[in-house]
Design a protein with these regions (language model features):
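RNA-binding accessory domains that recognize and position tRNA/RNA substrates
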Residues: 1-66, 74, 81-88
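A conditional alpha-helix N-cap/helix-loop micro-motif detector
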Residues: 44, 108, 149-153
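Beta-sheet entry/capping signal
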Residues: 62, 88-90, 125, 167-170
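Generic beta-strand/beta-sheet core signal
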Residues: 66-68, 74, 92-95, 129-132, ...
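Short glycine/serine/threonine-rich phosphate/pyrophosphate-binding segments
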Residues: 73-76, 100
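Active-site adenylate/phosphate-handling loop in enzymes that bind or generate adenylated species
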Residues: 84, 97-101, 122, 137-218
């Protein structure tokens, strides 16, 4: 069984120098001095580092996140803030235009309120854009299912355009689960410059969100 005599901090750059002399027994670190493995906490730290490194690789200091008011996009915004700082994160808010009933109007108002609340708690600025009416653009009636798919494509286009305009990196909230189950629907659409949750199952995001909310309760659960 080995003994740990020195350790660098986890998920941080550091220079660790430990002198070792032949025949000299060094004191080992106590168990309480060693980091305790907590999968969700370490996963979050790894994701923060991944966003920071990818932004550097893209030559960008800022990131754009499409805010939808749901868990994945809210958690992604919090991740970007932890990685780059709130002043370097922009939230894109895309309105919905296919609202026909009072219930839909109420749901959209609640969604917009949730999005603005998340942006306020994270101290990030938002860019609001309106989605074009698919039926008018295509000059035909569009079913609800087609309209939702077209909105997803439009959101990707708006995300790409906003990122290009601001010289920022576009982040995608897609998880490993969505890449596996919705691959045909994703083909042909813009999915951002980087998807931090691409190797994280959708079911894991809830547990990661709880870890992030211990710092400050910004992510809806």
């Amino acid at each position: 069984c080995g003994r740990v005599v020195a350790q660098a901090p986890c998920f941080e750059e550091s220079l660790l120098v430990q002198e070792i002399q032949r025949g000299v027994m060094l004191d080992a670190l106590e168990d309480h001095e060693l980091p305790e493995f907590r999968s969700e906490e370490w996963l979050w730290q790894a994701l923060v580092l991944a966003v920071r490194d990818n932004a550097r690789a893209h030559g960008a200091s800022r990131a754009v996140v499409a805010l939808e008011g749901d868990l994945p996009s809210s958690l992604l915004a919090a991740l970007a803030v932890d990685a780059l700082g709130p002043r370097n994160v922009i939230g894109l808010v895309l309105g919905r235009n296919r609202i026909f009933t009072p219930a839909q109007e109420e749901a959209e108002a609640a969604r917009c309120a949730a999005v603005r609340a998340i942006a306020e708690r994270l101290h990030i600025r938002t860019v609001e854009r309106d989605a074009p009416d698919a039926a008018r653009v295509l000059d035909r009636d569009v079913s609800a299912g087609d309209a939702e798919r077209l909105r997803s494509r439009t959101l990707g286009l708006m995300l790409e355009d906003t990122a290009l305009e601001l010289g920022a990196m576009a982040l995608s909230p897609l998880s490993k689960t969505e890449y596996a189950l919705a691959a045909p629907a994703l083909c042909g659409g813009y999915q951002g410059d980087f998807a931090p949750f691409g190797d994280v199952y959708l079911s894991t995001l809830e547990f990661v969100a709880r870890v992030r909310n211990r710092t400050s309760a910004v992510v809806p659960q």
